[in-house]
Amino acid sequence: MSFNSNASKYQAENTVDKLFSNILHTSTTSKSVSKSKSKSKSKPKPISSTQLLVNQLQSTNTTANNNNTKRKKHNNNKRINKTLLEEKKFSKFIKYNHIKQKSNKSELDEKYLNKLVRKNINSLNKINKIDDLLIDEELNQIKQELLEENEFVGMGGGQLKGGKRLRKKLLNNTKQVIDEFDGFGEISSSNNNNKKKNSSHPGLTPGLAPVDYEEEDDE
């Protein structure tokens, strides 16, 4: 490239130098700005005490909400299970009454009744785990009566007693046997006297005889 004079050459060189200086200065400035931004991002900002308190409260509220949700879910499941259990018991009750009213019972009906008997006997065994000989005898007697009643129901008559009634009968019979037992294998005389006094005529207050009753009739 040729120049007409030294002045024009000098002017051109100055223009090129300014241009390069501007380019280099801009790039250097942008690099410094990016470095300062990266440094500011890398340094964590200090958290104030107020912000710490807010964060703790939010965490506590979240935990409390989770606990309330779990408790509500547990109660809801418990309510559902209780409803299902009641419906199941009611359906079993309906099924039992339907089978009980049949004159001719099928093999499946007999199996279902036997299952009820076994279930009631198992309930008695769980409630009455006592080694006393007298109570065991009473328990065996109740079991035998339950089996006989089931056979009668299977033939089209009678009703199968529930576990609650059997338990009550068992407790009453056991209490009576224990009260009458004097420890020597005999019934106490006082209880025998009470039985004689209470064995009066039917339909009357114990100890009272009929109006037309006469002592000569006993002779």
Curated annotation (Swiss-Prot):
Keywords: Nucleus, Transcription, Transcription regulation
Ranges of compositional bias, category Basic residues: 34-44, 69-79
Coiled-coil features, chain-numbered ranges: none
Signal peptide range: none
One cellular component (GO) term of this entry: nucleolus
Superkingdom of origin organism: Eukaryota
Start and end residues of each stretch annotated as Disordered: 27-51, 60-79, 184-219
Family: Belongs to the RRT14 family.
Name of the protein: Regulator of rDNA transcription 14
